[in-house]
Amino acid sequence: MADARRAPLKDQTDISGARALIVEARFYDDLQDALLDGAVAELKAAGLTHDVITVPGALEIPAAVAIAVDAAAANGKPYDAVIALGCVIRGDTIHFEIVSQESSRALMDLAVSRKLPLGNGILTVNTEAQAWARARASELNKGGDAARAALAMLRIKRRLARA
C-alpha cells in the first residue's frame, strides 16, 4: 500500500541496465524475506540487475557494503546503487541504540564519501508487530521504500552527470 503522505518522484531518468547491491542482515529470517521481496520487486520494475550479500546483523552491513563496492569496482563491474536491509527490535539494553545509530551513521558516511546512491531499509522498531507492519509489501513496504530511495538517488546522479 502506498503511503499517501509521500508524493511520487517525477524524475524518470533512465536507469535501466544499472546494477544494484542489496546487503541484508538475516537476524530475523521471515521479516527479512518480506523486506527483500519488496526491494527486489522495485529493482526489477526499474530494469536493474542485483546481487544479494547476507551478513549476520545490522552492524555488519556498512563494512560489507564497503568491501563489496570496492571489489566490484576493482573487477570492472561497479555497483550503481546499494540497498541496506535489516531489522533492529528494541530490547532491555542500550544495544538497540548502538546498533541503530552506528549502522545508520556508517551507511550515511559511505553514501556521502563515495557519492553512492543508497537506500537504508534497516528497520528500527519497538516490537515485532511494528517490524511486520513495515516489512510487508501489502502494508508499509519499507524494503520497497529503501529500493525506491536508492533508485531516486541514482536517477539524480545520472541526470546531473549528463548536465
UniProtKB/Swiss-Prot annotation:
One Pfam entry name: DMRL_synthase
Active-site residues annotated for this sequence: 95
Keywords carried by this UniProt record: Riboflavin biosynthesis, Transferase
The keyword Repressor is annotated on this UniProt entry: no
Protein name: 6,7-dimethyl-8-ribityllumazine synthase 1
Binding residue positions for 5-amino-6-(D-ribitylamino)uracil: 27, 58-60, 87-89, 120
InterPro entries reported for this sequence: LS (IPR034964), LS/RS (IPR002180), LS/RS_sf (IPR036467)
Catalytic activity of the protein: (2S)-2-hydroxy-3-oxobutyl phosphate + 5-amino-6-(D-ribitylamino)uracil = 6,7-dimethyl-8-(1-D-ribityl)lumazine + phosphate + 2 H2O + H(+)
NCBIfam families noted in UniProt: lumazine-synth (TIGR00114)
Taxonomic lineage of the native organism: Bacteria, Pseudomonadati, Pseudomonadota, Alphaproteobacteria, Hyphomicrobiales
Glycoprotein as UniProt keyword: no
A Gene Ontology cellular-component term: cytoplasm
CDD domains: Lumazine_synthase-I
Organism: Bradyrhizobium diazoefficiens (strain JCM 10833 / BCRC 13528 / IAM 13628 / NBRC 14792 / USDA 110)
Functional summary from the UniProt entry: Catalyzes the formation of 6,7-dimethyl-8-ribityllumazine by condensation of 5-amino-6-(D-ribitylamino)uracil with 3,4-dihydroxy-2-butanone 4-phosphate. This is the penultimate step in the biosynthesis of riboflavin.
